[in-house]
Amino acid sequence: MRGILYGVGVGPGDPELMTLKAVRLIKENDIIAVPGAEVRETVAYKIAVQAVPELADKELLPIYMPMTHDKAELELNHEKGAKALEAALDTGKNVVFLTLGDPTIYSTFSYVQKRVEADGYETRLVSGITSFCATAARLNIPLTEWNQPLHVQPAVHRLDSELDQPGTYVLMKSGKKMNQVKEILAKSGRNIRMVENCGMPDEHIYNSVEEIPDDAGYYSCLLYTSPSPRD
């Protein structure tokens, strides 16, 4: 009998924000897959091992996920990752794949999940706290009130033409484009706040667009808000 592949969110950075279910699945299963070549150096592993010290003694399966826009290279590595997971599942053991935040939000897990499912294997998703929910909590502010919409998107090329709707915008994957993002947001007149490395030891909070450094890291989450509908 084949094992089940679990995509488990470990939250944004603070190990105390990991769910009870995530902790239980890591404890109960022997094979833990982690996106990255050097598993013990990955952010997901470092978060999870603080909550589940037993993780250090588990069988760790590295799944290489390169940070590139080369579609051919991505496809090749996603396929290799899926095959490595399938080989582990064929032993009859479950595999727990650790992913930052929640596995349904810009997660590397989704790329291998589709391939593994297409080959007839069972997969299950286990929710984790998202980086943007943790960011709002860290800033002690609501993401939405009353009938305000919430927009979640990466910082893309046409950002200036996409931020004209009411509500709150969550801008993710802004690190490499931070200078451009700041220029656009500075013209908006809205409230801009950001948390870099939320919940991690090197966390930084920025309360205005002027405070945000151009070289902010990859794990930076911006909140771009309009005034409260009750104001």
Show the residue positions of the predicted features:
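Conserved anion/nucleotide-ligand pocket segment
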Residues: 165-193
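Class I SAM-dependent methyltransferase SAM-binding "motif I" and its flanking Rossmann-like core
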Residues: 104-165
